[in-house]
Amino acid sequence: MNFRFPFLLMITISLIGAVLTFGNDVRPRNQYGNEIFCPHQGFNQKCNAICKRKKYLLGFCDQKTCLCKVRP
């Protein structure tokens, strides 16, 4: 009985840590804490998140191909 409680506690803490770590992976946040999206994109899409993760900060998100393009 004494062994089960710390074991379950460690598992629970690890799961919470994993959710908090990877929860921002799809929708990254800027330095002000706001979620980053493409201007013409809905809240459930990942295209702009991929663009921001690849550091195309001066680029834009192509809606058809979901690719990041750099502005000329």
Curated annotation (Swiss-Prot):
* Taxonomic superkingdom: Eukaryota
* GO CC terms of this entry: extracellular region
Localisation per UniProt entry? Secreted
Please tell me in which tissues this protein is expressed. Expressed by the venom gland.
Q: What coarse category fits the chief subcellular location reported for this protein?
A: secreted
GO function term, MF aspect, one: sodium channel regulator activity
Q: Which residues form the signal peptide?
A: 1-21
Q: Which residues form a coiled coil?
A: none
Cysteine disulfide partners in this protein: C38-C61, C47-C66, C51-C68
**Keywords recorded for this protein, A-Z:** Disulfide bond, Ion channel impairing toxin, Neurotoxin, Secreted, Signal, Toxin, Voltage-gated sodium channel impairing toxin
Tell me its family. Belongs to the long (3 C-C) scorpion toxin superfamily.
Reported function: Binds to sodium channels (Nav) and affects the channel activation process.
Q: What is this protein called?
A: Putative sodium channel toxin Ts18
* Native species: Tityus serrulatus (Brazilian scorpion)
